[in-house]
Amino acid sequence: MAAVLTLAASCSIKEDRSPCPCWLSIDFSRCNRSSVTVSAWGEEEIFSERVAVQDYQESEIYEKTVPKGFVNTSVITGEREMKRSGARLIIPMGHDADSIYAHASTVECFGEFAQDTAVLHKQFARVFMSVEIPIGHEYPYTFQACSDVCGIDIRDLSPVEGEFKIDLKLDEENICMFCLPRQRESGGNLKLLIYEGNEVIETIPLAEWINQMGYNWLKKDLEDIYVGVDYAKAEVSISIRGWDDGYSFKVEI
């Protein structure tokens, strides 16, 4: 009797099928990560769950029913410190971005079946900074990176505006590395602040200088950035990984 009731509640061939849900399939065959967070959005969130990719090794297909219409799909991996707030993934103050790889797409789910293929792309830029200090000199300055982008919208991988700030600590070789989230196309208000004690003595307009090099914040996979600070020459240099040329800028330190 239960089976009969279930059948009666579903869509039959003779019925108007427009209210029936759509089966959304997401192909994981190009997703070479151990686990991902899969989400879908219509006017509001439809579902979001953590998935072990290995559980889908045989079929390589993840399936869910969704309401008919346009559906935004999101597949993300690499979350560590960043926190979900609705459709946004936010960087906590004082931290850098997580190493996020992600896929986002708008799928037309108007029929009985729809399909998407998850292809993960690099949503962060590693910034490697090295400081040249003459032997026998003690470096009197500290650094802070700041921006007006504090996260990512998982529905379309666009930047989320908000305060981003991290104190940079040099290692024993006077090198540090931090991760930036995808910035706005212009680079926004990305800056490197140089402090002497509690006073900012120099502001390096990283966004402006990086843009002068032709860096593209809209690329699917963001490139890494190298910043060199030469204390003796009072010079800052910027280069992009894999590029032959770089830029050097004089600063008054």
Question: Which stretches of residues belong to each language-model region?
Answer:
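Structured interaction patches on ligand/partner-binding surfaces of diverse proteins
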Residues: 79-115, 198-233
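A surface/extracellular/periplasmic glyco- and lipid-processing/surface-interacting theme
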Residues: 127
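Bacterial Sec-dependent N-terminal signal peptides
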Residues: 4-32, 246, 250
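Eukaryotic extended interaction platforms
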Residues: 227-253
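Tryptophan-paired
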Residues: 36-84, 140-212, 251
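Conserved "repeat-terminator" motif of extracellular CCP/Sushi domains
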Residues: 117-124
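Structural motif
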Residues: 25-39, 130-138
